C-alpha cells in the first residue's frame, strides 16, 4: 500500500477540483437545453438501503444503469449521483485497496480517520466532487438517481426538501435484505466494511424504513433483494409511471415554462 502522505493527498484533491472546474459555462447552458425536453426531467429518485443490500444491482434492474451506457447514466436518462464511485476511485489513486477498509478501520484507526473523517480527506473530497457533479445536473433540472444508505433520516429528509424546492418530484426505492445476507455480500464487495459497521448501518436503516415510507407517502417502493432476482413487475411499473408522468411540482412547472421561453427567444443558444 502506498504511503498516504499529506503531499499526495493534497495533490490528488487539487487534480480532482481542477478536473471539475474545467467544465465551462457553455456546458451548463447545454444541460439546460437538454433538460427542458429530457424524458426524466425534474424527477429525483432516492435509493436507500444498508451496505450489501444490492442497491447497485437493483438500480441496474430498474433503471438500466450501466447497461450499454456509462455507470453514471441510466437507460431512462436519469443521472446517477453516488459519492462512493469517486471515493473508491480516489482510494485506488492513493494506493489503497477498497477491500482493505474493514481491516484499516480495526487495525489502523488513525489512517481510517484520515480517510473518512478528516476535512479535506478522501471521503470529504469525494463528497464535494459529487456535490459539484450534482449541481451541474440540477442546473438543467436533469433527472437524478441519488444513491445512498439511508442511515441518516434527517440528512435525507433535507435532501428531499432541497430537491423539491428546485422543482423536482421525488420518489424513494428502499432496497431491503436480511442482515445475514448483507454481511455475506459485504465480504464479496469491491469495498469491504467491518461487520460491526455493516450491522450498525443495517439496524439504523431498518429503524428508518417506516419513517421513509411516511415521508414519501405513495412515492415509495420496497424491493426485497435478499435473493438476486428480477424486480417485481408491479414495482417496476409503478416506478416507470412516476418517471414518465407529467411534472406535479409547481416550482418545476414554472422552471420548464421559463426555460422554454428563454430558449425560444434565443437567450439560451
How should each PLM-predicted stretch be described?
Residues 179-269:
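Conserved GTP-binding G-domain of TRAFAC-class P-loop NTPases and closely related GTPase folds
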Residues 13-35:
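N-terminal pre-Walker A segment at the start of P-loop NTPase domains
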Residues 50-51:
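The conserved Walker
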Residues 55:
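Conserved lysine of the Walker
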Residues 58:
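Hydrophobic positions on the alpha1 helix immediately C-terminal to the Walker A/P-loop
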Residues 62-140, 154:
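Conserved substrate/cofactor phosphate-moiety recognition/catalytic segment
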Amino acid at each position: 500500500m502506498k504511503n498516504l502522505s499529506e503531499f499526495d493527498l493534497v495533490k490528488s484533491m487539487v487534480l480532482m477540483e481542477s478536473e471539475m472546474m474545467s467544465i465551462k459555462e457553455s456546458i451548463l447552458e447545454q444541460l439546460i437545453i437538454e433538460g427542458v425536453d429530457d424524458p426524466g426531467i425534474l424527477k429525483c429518485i432516492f435509493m436507500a438501503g444498508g451496505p450489501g443490500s444490492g442497491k447497485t444491482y437493483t438500480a441496474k434492474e430498474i433503471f438500466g444503469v450501466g447497461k450499454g451506457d456509462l455507470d453514471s447514466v441510466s437507460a431512462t436518462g436519469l443521472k446517477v449521483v453516488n459519492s462512493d464511485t469517486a471515493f473508491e476511485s480516489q482510494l485506488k489513486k492513493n494506493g489503497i485497496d477498497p477491500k482493505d477498509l474493514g481491516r484499516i478501520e480495526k487495525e489502523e484507526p488513525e489512517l481510517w480517520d484520515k480517510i473518512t473523517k478528516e476535512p479535506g480527506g478522501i471521503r470529504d473530497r469525494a463528497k464535494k466532487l459529487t456535490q459539484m457533479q450534482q449541481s451541474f445536473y440540477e442546473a438543467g433540472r436533469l433527472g437524478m438517481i441519488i444513491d445512498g444508505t439511508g442511515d441518516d433520516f434527517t440528512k435525507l429528509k433535507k435532501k428531499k426538501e432541497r430537491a423539491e424546492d428546485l422543482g423536482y418530484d421525488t420518489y424513494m426505492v428502499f432496497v431491503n435484505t436480511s442482515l445475514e445476507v448483507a454481511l455475506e455480500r459485504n465480504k464479496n464487495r469491491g469495498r469491504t466494511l467491518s461487520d460491526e459497521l455493516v450491522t450498525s448501518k443495517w439496524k439504523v436503516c431498518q429503524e428508518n424504513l417506516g419513517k421513509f415510507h411516511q415521508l414519501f407517502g405513495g412515492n415509495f417502493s420496497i424491493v426485497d433483494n435478499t435473493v438476486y432476482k428480477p424486480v417485481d413487475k408491479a414495482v417496476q411499473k409503478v416506478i416507470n409511471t412516476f418517471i414518465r408522468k407529467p411534472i406535479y411540482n409547481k416550482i418545476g412547472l414554472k422552471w420548464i415554462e421559463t426555460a422554454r421561453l428563454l430558449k425560444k427567444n434565443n437567450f439560451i443558444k
